[in-house]
């Protein structure tokens, strides 16, 4: 059974140096504004796997894994999209170890799991959220969805006005 938490005190695990634990936790995940659109994780509480290891010289090595769907509009055609995002990230927090060995999600032995999950999801987002990879998007001239219109969808282009005088030429 999953525990419900977003702030987790690692000292409650009572790990000794070199010891580790794997936990299944439910974490609230906030939505994203991406490309001017709003995307919501579904479900709003993601089940995450947290692996915690106590390091020999103090501090923790952490691994976070989660998978969730994001619901929102396709960036190409505006139809509903629901891609699944998988996350597998690691953090190290070693007191006195310098900036590279200090996790921004740790305050002493307290881990802000919700912030870490949110940031990890944000970094795992694809360049475009689409309803399907083959989505052709919308016609830039009329706005029709190109997947529905088919390959025969075309528009006559207006002739370039700079060439207008050539149309006035009469050949006999």
Where are these regions (language model features)?
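Structured interface patches
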Residues: 1-172
